[in-house]
A protein has these predicted regions:
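Long, low-complexity, Lys/Arg-enriched
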Residues: 1-101, 109-158
């Protein structure tokens, strides 16, 4: 079994009509399950538009998605991210046979750092870093803001 453990960020699921990191990883590293770790802001985005689950379903319709709602309101503070470490440790222990993919490209810089450290600390993990389509910052491309915009970007995704 291959499991993608991933935070979500504003570039997910799509930005500027291109895959965000989560979708890119699923296209190139098919997984059986996705464990989606959400901070409070991303929980609200998912609740409003189902953007992450819709995006995942658009590229991997048969994958199982488990959503972990952390309630974290300050993801820029390392001390708030122990919940992510604990969630991964629990999932890792629950699936001792799994191959793990870790998305180190989504979320705040602090979340990305924690994800990279998890990849170093646990065997059977592979850290996956996804560059932006422009190979530089995504500042010029706005993230999805409405469900209609999400559907348009998913349908026209390059």
């Amino acid at each position: 079994m291959r499991i993608l453990f991933t935070p979500a960020g504003d570039t997910d699921p799509v930005r500027g009509y291109h895959d965000g990191a989560i979708l890119h990883i699923l296209r190139h590293y098919p997984a059986d399950k996705v464990i989606l770790f959400l901070t409070k802001d991303m929980e609200e985005k998912e609740a409003a538009m189902q953007c992450y689950t819709r995006g995942i379903a658009s590229v991997a319709p048969d994958v199982t998605v488990e959503i972990l709602r952390s309630g974290i309101t300050e993801p820029q503070k390392y001390e708030k991210l122990t919940a992510m470490q604990d969630a991964f440790a629990s999932a890792y222990d629950a699936h001792p046979e799994a191959e793990w993919l870790l998305n180190v490209s989504s979320g705040t810089p602090q979340i990305k750092t924690v994800m990279a450290l998890l990849a170093l600390d646990y065997p059977r993990t592979k850290a996956i870093q996804v560059p932006s389509p422009e190979r530089k910052s995504n500042r010029g491309n706005h993230p999805c803001r409405t469900a209609d915009e999400l559907i348009e970007m998913l349908n026209c995704n390059e």
